Amino acid sequence: MVSVAFKQNLKKKYGIKFNNEKLLEDAFTHSSYANEHPGRKDYEKLEFLGDAVLELAVSDYLYRHFPRLNEGELTRMRSNIVRTEGFSEFAIECGFPEEINLGKGEEKAGARKRKTLLEDVFEAFNGALFLDQGMPAVQHFLHLTVYPLIAEGDFNASRDYKTELQERLQVNGPVKIEYQVISEDESKPSFKVQLLVNGEKVSEGQGRNKKAAEQQAAQAALDKNK
């Protein structure tokens, strides 16, 4: 069962109160739990729907907010957003892992922390929200969770700063480039890395995942050498 505290947080933080709470329950029910509890439905069909809903919602947002990007750049950015790592982090941020109904075997196997499962639940939740309240409610939820990070450039696929930096530094021969994690907070999540060139610190970067932090560090290094 989805906890009362979670439902209260949904209302307080995101303004979401399900009219049909069974949809919410189904969105957090893994097939392993449904197999152990006859009569319970798992989230697989909601996940199927949510995948399509999220792709449409994100595509619409990118089309409206990034008019200068071409089709290829928009596609790459969308791919970065909807990848497993991205949605699993949003699921963690929203407190989804604790609410998932798992079978005993999956619970023992640590499935609650599995990124692919968290991505599935995030998609299922949005599928359930779409059925319960329509696309405007989904867009509202994404405006509070996903879209702010798109606006900040966390998923920018139009430039690859790491590759640009590597090409610039190695123009005269091999150079050792390292990205080291300084700190991480998986509860948020947030990563901070430092960039070393031939063992010397050049810059730092921070992001909601290691890849984003490394890109920011590379961008900072490029900005220093403009």
Curated annotation (Swiss-Prot):
Supply the name of the protein: Ribonuclease 3
Compartment(s):
Cytoplasm
Record GO terms (molecular function): double-stranded RNA binding; metal ion binding; ribonuclease III activity; rRNA binding
- Subunit structure, interactors included: Homodimer.
Q: Gene name?
A: rnc
Task: List the lineage, top down.
Answer: Bacteria, Bacillati, Bacillota, Bacilli, Lactobacillales
Pfam families documented for this protein: dsrm, Ribonucleas_3_3
Record keywords, A-Z: Cytoplasm, Endonuclease, Hydrolase, Magnesium, Metal-binding, mRNA processing, Nuclease, RNA-binding, rRNA processing, rRNA-binding, tRNA processing
Q: Which residue range or ranges hold the RNase III domain?
A: 7-134
Known EC number: 3.1.26.3
